[in-house]
UniProtKB/Swiss-Prot annotation:
Residue positions where Phosphoserine is found in the record: S78
Protein name per UniProt: Probable protein phosphatase 2C 48
Pfam families: PP2C
Binding-site list for Mn(2+) 2: D89, D290, D349
Amino acid sequence: MVSTTFRRIVSPCWRPFGIGEDSSPGSDDTNGRLDGLLWYKDSGNHITGEFSMAVVQANNLLEDHSQLESGPISLHESGPEATFVGVYDGHGGPEAARFVNDRLFYNIKRYTSEQRGMSPDVITRGFVATEEEFLGLVQEQWKTKPQIASVGACCLVGIVCNGLLYVANAGDSRVVLGKVANPFKELKAVQLSTEHNASIESVREELRLLHPDDPNIVVLKHKVWRVKGIIQVSRSIGDAYLKRAEFNQEPLLPKFRVPERFEKPIMRAEPTITVHKIHPEDQFLIFASDGLWEHLSNQEAVDIVNSCPRNGVARKLVKAALQEAAKKREMRYSDLEKIERGIRRHFHDDITVIVVFLHATNFATRTPISVKGGGLLSAHNPVL
């Protein structure tokens, strides 16, 4: 008998998603499709398999940006090929996430060319270069648009290259591996990313070690741990007001200013990087912003992907998270769907999901591809 819990988890696979459900393999969704506050690309091919993407908007302006790039990961024709996945969860506004979406992949390609190969050092250099570029933009716009100093983005990157998976994370987005765990072919969820959120004790300890003379480096405020009592994440690209003292002053709004002058950055942009050798039992990767993980556990997400057809599976994950969000507020999912952006943020965050299947099939392609998550949802955001 199917358990109630399992039925609830995989139910998105058994019922129609809603308006715009038509997602047959032959349908043309080259640039994705838009259905209200939902953008999705149900299926696509990368160099070693297939992928599925979905984004749902909650904020008045979409703060999540994302991309999937498959093909050369170097500026040289002789360089390696890879599949690159980026999930950029903005806060304070969309500007930093949008900037990272435009610049990080290029910077990593540039350093891959210089170093003649992929490595953790190449990725770190790409993050740091993108950070410096954005802080330069903040400097340029400081007098006319000071609020840009309070904008940042959590950045999660995955690169599949030459049989290795490189995972780089700065912030609290997450990537989870679905892996065959036993002879019965059951899939186990394995988290591959390290998160930087002050709710995690090890993150608080790291901050205290880095700032031993600051008793207020982490503060418990309204039952939530925050860096300097302001922000939950300890690493990001952007958030210039907590990295350079020159931005910790007027005309920045008082709620973003810290009372003490600081000499070294309070937040960092350098990611934590792990390298994972891909094995035959490794089936797929789920990359998602924290909006998904607020409502689904790692294992629940893996079970959904394992139980659903590949086509449209990212959209199924988004629906499962929204169903949980509605349940927590004791409302119907159909009523949640009717709530407009902005107001919707009181019920859930922007959610980005990219599912990447790892092993080559008949659907794999050597043709370079580039997909930006969000499509027309992102087009409403202001250009810097």
